[in-house]
Amino acid sequence: MTKKVAIILANEFEDIEYSSPKEALENAGFNTVVIGDTANSEVVGKHGEKVTVDVGIAEAKPEDYDALLIPGGFSPDHLRGDTEGRYGTFAKYFTKNDVPTFAICHGPQILIDTDDLKGRTLTAVLNVRKDLSNAGAHVVDESVVVDNNIVTSRVPDDLDDFNREIVKQLQ
């Protein structure tokens, strides 16, 4: 059975941090499913890429997925603004149950809402690192960091390393 990767996404995502990992995963034979506020709605990246949401967060069941991908840009901040905290709850399933969780740039912000970062080693874009540290994570400045089931990366320049690692984690 082909593995399915949930991608949580909102407006102002960093286009390349969505499209590049998605392409790497699909080229490796994995299915990707975009989860957002409402099924069949459209989200638009910072540079204009338009993506149709496959499954609304209200209908999304984390146990249906083999991994979670959280691209950066301003999308994670919008997702964290969900008044019901549904994206943090969705992500918590992955972190709590040791299911592969991939986050780049601002993406690790969502992981703060899982309350599962204490003692974890992560990386992220510079302006998110203090927040991760305050949530109990040990934060380092490396292109890719693997801590058990969580893979994090900093910026688009790290995408080759990030993509290689996330595919490896699912093989």
Curated annotation (Swiss-Prot):
Record-linked PROSITE patterns: PEPTIDASE_C56_PFPI
Residue stretches making up the PfpI endopeptidase domain: 3-171
Entries under Pfam families matching the protein: DJ-1_PfpI
Domain of life: Bacteria
InterPro entries, per the entry: C56_PfpI-like, Class_I_gatase-like, DJ-1/PfpI
Family that this chain belongs to: Belongs to the peptidase C56 family.
Name recorded for this polypeptide: Uncharacterized protein SAV1875
